From Swiss-Prot:
It comes from Parasynechococcus marenigrum (strain WH8102). HAMAP family: Pterin_4_alpha. Pfam families: Pterin_4a. This is Putative pterin-4-alpha-carbinolamine dehydratase. Belongs to the pterin-4-alpha-carbinolamine dehydratase family. InterPro entries: PCD_sf (IPR036428), Pterin_deHydtase (IPR001533). Disulfide bonds: none annotated. It is an enzyme of class 4 (lyase). Gene3D superfamilies: Transcriptional coactivator/pterin dehydratase. Keywords: Lyase. Its EC number is 4.2.1.96. One of its GO terms (biological process) is tetrahydrobiopterin biosynthetic process. GO terms for molecular function: 4-alpha-hydroxytetrahydrobiopterin dehydratase activity.
Amino acid sequence: MIAMPTLLSADQRQTLPATLPHWTVHEQSISRELVFNDFNEAFGFMSRVALLAEGRNHHPNWSNVYNRVSITLSTHDLGGLSDLDVELAAAIDQLLPA
């Protein structure tokens, strides 16, 4: 049985800059901009994220222009930022070099 996502409380949202320092917190989403060496590196990263997202059945809004990837996470069914977004953001961060 898959757990239902829950919207983050105001207190939980306030802790996000400490737990996800590379992400920007918005009213109903979080976002991150990434720059890679070239298109192949950016696309390879997106492929790895796609596998993570598919495994969680939670998919980012994103775009790619050459070596840049823009990611926005929000739980549309709930109309805002949920625990699923935080979990996916943390998993995405784990794909990147420290």
